[in-house]
Amino acid sequence: MSLRDKIEHAIQNQPCTVKDLKARFGGDRGADRKVMEALDALVHEAVVCQRSGVFFTVRSGRAEKALLCKVVKLGKNFAFVMLEDETSDIFIPGRFTRGAMPGDEVLVEKFEHPRVEGSDEGAILAVLTEKNDLVGTARRIEGRLKFVPDDCPAISMQLMRDCEGGAKDGDKVAVEILMRGSRQEDHRVGVAMRFGSSDEAKRCAKALLYARDIHTRFPDKVREEAKKFEGMTVSEEDCKGRMDLRALPIFTIDSAETKDIDDAISLTRTPEGGFELGVHIADVSNYVKPGSELNEEAFNRATSVYYADQVVPMLPKSLSNGICSLNEKELRLAFSCLMRLDKDGNLTDYRFVKSVICSRVKGVYAEINALLAGTADAEIQAKYAEVADQLPAMKELYAHRARLRTERGCIDFESGEVKLILDEDGHCIDVKKRTSGESEAMIEEFMLLANQCAAHFARVKQIPFVYRVHEEPNGEKLERLHALLQACGINDHFAKEVPTPKELSAILEGVRGTAFEQIVNTGMLRCMSKACYEEKPKGHYGQVLKDYAHFTSPIRRYPDLAIHRIMTDLLSGTDKETMAIRYTDFAIQASKQSSEREVIAVQIERKAEDCYKAEYARRHLGECYEGIISGVTQRGLFIELENGVEGFVPASSLTPTGTMLTEGIRLSDPVSGKNWNLGDSMMITIVRADVNLGKIDFEVAPEAKQ
C-alpha cells in the first residue's frame, strides 16, 4: 500500500491532524515532506478535506451534512456559494474560501454566524470540480504582469513568465489556471487567448462571449452541413402538399438592418366585417432536422445573441439570412397561423397550415409609421403600393386589440432600450433612447396572437410542448416594490397579497408623465418573476394569458423551432401516443436548455451594452449633463442621463459629513439638511469610465454644488 493510500485509509477510519499524520507516517524532515505531499494531493483531488485543522474524507464530510454548492461570486475577502438546487446562497468568509474560484463545485459546511444570531455562514471544505478558465485583464502591478479576473477585480494572480502569450498591460485576455495555491492570489495562470485592449468595447464583448462559451464560428461539421443550403431556392416540388398563399399580398415589417426575417403578415376583411389575419413564420423545421449537426448546434446555442451592431446567430447564415429568411420577392416555405377575428377584434378561430408564400416588400418600421401617420413621401408610398391598402385595416384591428389588452390588464413596461451608434471602427460614438411607434406595437400584438394560438393548440391537443411561462411575483420582491411605492407616496396592498396585473398597470398609468415614471417602471420590472420555458402550461402573468408559447422566431430561438417540429408531426397525422413517446423528453430538455441559454444571452447583451456605454462616456470626460436619480444606496446615487447612460455618484463626493439612507429613496446630510431624493434631477460631470467593467462614475457638477 502506498503512503498516499495509507494516509487516506487512516483518515477514513479516524479524522486526523497534520501532527497525527506526521507522528504516524513521518519521523524526519524527508518523511514529513512526503506526508505533506501525499496529503496535499489528496486534498487537491477532493478525496480529503479539512475542517478546523482536522482532515477527514469527503465521504465522511457528506455524511456530516456538508452541502454540495457552486461558487457564484468572489470578493477580496469573501465568497458566495449557491446550493445545488439553487434555492439559496451561503456567505463564505475569506479565510474559509480555500482558493475556490467562481464556477468551482465545492463542498460546504454551514454554521451559525458567531456574532449575528439567526445568520448563517459557511466554510468550503473541499473543491470538488475546478473551473480553471477565466477572463479578465492583464495589468502591470509592482513591476510584474499580473492577471485581474473580471469576476473579482480586487484580486490579482501571477502570470507565469513563459505563458504570457504576448499580452501587454491593459489587454483583455482569457487564461487558464496552471497551478492552484491555497489562496486565490497564489494561483498561477497562463494566457490562452488575447482579445486586444480592454479600453475597446468590441474587444470586451468578444471576451464576454468567450467566457460564456458562445462561439462566433460554427463547428466544421455544422458548416459543412450548412453548405448545401447556400444559394438554395424553393422549387415547385418543395411546394407540393402546402397551402399556396402566393396570391396574398404578404409583407414583412422589421428594422432596416434586419437580415434574419422570421415573420410576415397579411390581413383581409371578412364579409361580416371582421378580419382574417395571417402570421406567416419561416419554416425552419423543414430544413433543420432531428439528428442533424445543425439541430444539435442550434439546441446547444438555443438563441441568437445580439449586441451593438453584431449578432451571433443560432443558425449559419445560409439558413438564417438565406433559405429560411422571408426575403422580399423570394419564394419561401412557411408555417402559417391563419386567424379569424370579429369586428371588435376578438379571436374566434384559428388554424395552422404549412404554406408557400412570397413577401411583396421588406417593410421598415419607420416607413410604416410614416404611412400610418399620413406623412410618408412619394418614394415610400410607391414602395408599399402593393400592400398599403391593408394598413388601415391593420391599424383598426390593432386599436381593437390594444383596447382588449387594456381591459384584461396587461402590464406594458417602457423598455428603456438604447441604440448604440458606432463609427466605422466599431467604437461607440453616441447613445440614443430607442423609440417605438405604432407599427412596432402592431407587429408585437399580431405575433402575440399567433403565440397564444400555438399554446392553445398544444394544450387542447394534449401534446408535449415548450410553453413560455411567466409566474406571478414572489413575496420578497413584492415587499421591495411595496417599499418603493410607499416612498413615492403611492398606496398599495402588495405587502399582504399578490396584485393583479391590472392593479400594476393602473399604477404605471398613474405615474405616467411624473418624476416617478421611470423609477416605478424600473422597480416594477425588477419585481417581476423571470419568464422561462417549461413543458407544462402555467400561463403568462404579465400578458394575462392562460396560453402562451414562442412560435414566431424559429430562426433565432430554439423553443420556436422545437414547437414547429412538434406541431408539424401532429398535423401530419401522428397519433397522440406516438407524440408522447417521441417528444415528452425532448420538450423537457428543450425547455431547460433554452431557459438556461436565454439567461446567459441576456446577461451578455446587457454587459456588452454597459461596455459600449462606458466607451461612449470616455469620449465625454469632464462634460456636464442633467440626469435623474434612478437609484439610492448607502454608498451613493445612481444617475440616469436622458440618453439612457447610467453612472454612479459616491456618497463621499456629496458631502464630507456623511449621509443617512432612508428606505432606499433618499440620502440625507444631517448637518446641512440637504436631501437627494429618488426621481430628483441633478447636474453631473462624467469623471471616470471603465470600459472593461462597463462602469461610469459621476460627480455633482460644480454649479450644482453651489
Please tell me what each predicted stretch does.
Residues M1-G278, S285-E330, A366-A370, E615, ...:
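Charge-lined substrate channels and their catalytic hotspots, especially those that engage the 3′ end
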Residues A23, A174, R180, S197, ...:
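Electropositive polyanion-binding surfaces
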